[in-house]
């Protein structure tokens, strides 16, 4: 494992996510200045996900052919342009254009993951990829509160600050980050690979156990993405929180996420079977989403956010982990590709659906809808995943007390 290259790319990821997290919580406030209602704000958030769904796979293939470094430079330059356009926006359509430009060039994270795979060996790869989660959490601790603070001078200021982060990233990559793929490796990787087609996805969904996990991931993804994408709009509409106050709340959520991902997941998966934890997290999340829907005050909301973040973070990790254990080693890449496509679809559906529910029914509706989805998922998982022979087959490996590979 090349620690210098790994440290360099993790720094690039952190700076990129810092810029992203500066902006994301402020979009509903920015859109409101152009008289956008909740549904239109949901469309604004979804426009980025739609563009990213189109752009990220293309950028990923281009990075295989032309190398990680030039495509990462192009991707972050697109992010830079999107943030600048966001800062100078004087009409709602320009906000949409800014998010679409950022989304279509938004392959930053997937290319960084590929770079890490290039510079780590099989033993250390999981550890290297896990550092992205740490960078993500740290970015979401610092970014929202910084963006909220800067917004007191206008919403354009955080946008230009995010653009500055992207410019710094361009300089870091240009002057400091070497290419990770040799010409020989690029030639090998241009061999045509099986596409993640809609037909292939339907075939995967019909498989007895892994198909059930993918369906569970979709249902969980819709409920959790509604919480993530609508939260700022919910905070503005229900509690009239300022952008700065929402930033403080999201920083609190970021701290909870870092604790969950960095500490709790490893501890509890060494004690409990994964299917038991999945069922428990679904139940906890369903209950906490009822609390989110009905929270009468910000204090109650902060209390409710703790189990929501805990259950959501653990469940997201467990569904991915169980999915990779449920298929043959040569199928892992393909099944994770399907999971990524499902995640992208939930980030498109959730903000539109959540915005419509909030506008038409009220601030209680997104949380209530999420709770209903999670309650249905509870019974589905109990029937299809809990105590399944495949889960029981890898139970003993998980509980062994000498988990060197588990820690990696």
What is each of the regions a protein language model found here?
Residues 151-164, 356-374:
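A membrane-interface helix-boundary motif in multi-pass transporters
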Residues 97-137:
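Cytoplasmic helix-loop-helix junction between adjacent transmembrane helices
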């Amino acid at each position: 494992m090349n620690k210098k290259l790994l440290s360099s790319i993790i720094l690039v990821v952190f700076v990129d996510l810092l810029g992203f997290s500066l902006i994301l919580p402020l979009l509903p406030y920015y859109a409101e200045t152009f008289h956008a209602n909740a549904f239109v704000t949901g469309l604004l958030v979804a426009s980025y996900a739609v563009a990213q769904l189109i752009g990220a796979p293309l950028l990923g293939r281009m990075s295989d052919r032309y190398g990680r470094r030039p495509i990462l430079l192009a991707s972050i330059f697109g992010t830079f342009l999107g943030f600048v356009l966001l800062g100078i926006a004087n009409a709602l359509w320009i906000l949409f254009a800014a998010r679409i430009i950022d989304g279509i060039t938004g392959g930053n994270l997937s290319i960084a993951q590929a770079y890490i795979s290039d510079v780590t060996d099989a033993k250390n790869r999981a550890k290297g990829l896990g550092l992205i989660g740490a960078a993500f959490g740290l970015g979401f601790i610092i970014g929202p509160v910084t963006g909220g603070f800067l917004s007191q001078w206008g919403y354009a200021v955080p946008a230009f600050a995010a653009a500055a982060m992207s410019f710094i990233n361009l300089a870091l990559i240009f002057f400091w980050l070497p290419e990770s793929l040799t010409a020989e490796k690029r030639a090998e990787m241009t061999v045509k690979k099986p596409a993640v087609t809609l037909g292939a996805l339907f075939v995967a969904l019909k498989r007895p156990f892994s198909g059930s996990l993918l369906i569970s991931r979709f249902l969980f993804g819709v409920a959790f993405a509604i919480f993530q994408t609508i939260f700022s709009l919910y905070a503005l509409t229900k509690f009239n929180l300022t952008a700065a106050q929402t930033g403080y709340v999201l920083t609190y959520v970021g701290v909870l996420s870092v604790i969950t991902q960095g500490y709790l997941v490893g501890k509890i998966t060494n004690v409990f079977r994964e299917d038991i934890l999945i069922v428990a997290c679904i139940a906890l999340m369903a209950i906490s989403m009822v609390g989110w829907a009905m929270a009468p005050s910000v204090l109650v909301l902060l209390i409710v956010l703790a189990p929501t973040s805990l259950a959501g973070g653990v469940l997201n990790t467990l569904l991915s982990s169980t999915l990779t254990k449920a298929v043959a080693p040569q199928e892992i890449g393909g099944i994770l590709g399907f999971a990524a496509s499902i995640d992208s679809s939930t980030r498109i559906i959730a903000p539109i659906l959540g915005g419509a529910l909030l506008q038409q029914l009220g601030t209680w509706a997104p949380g209530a809808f999420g709770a209903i989805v999670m309650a249905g998922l509870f019974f589905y998982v109990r029937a299809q995943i809990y105590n399944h022979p495949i889960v029981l087959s890898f139970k003993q490996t998980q509980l062994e007390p000498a988990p060197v590979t588990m820690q990696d």
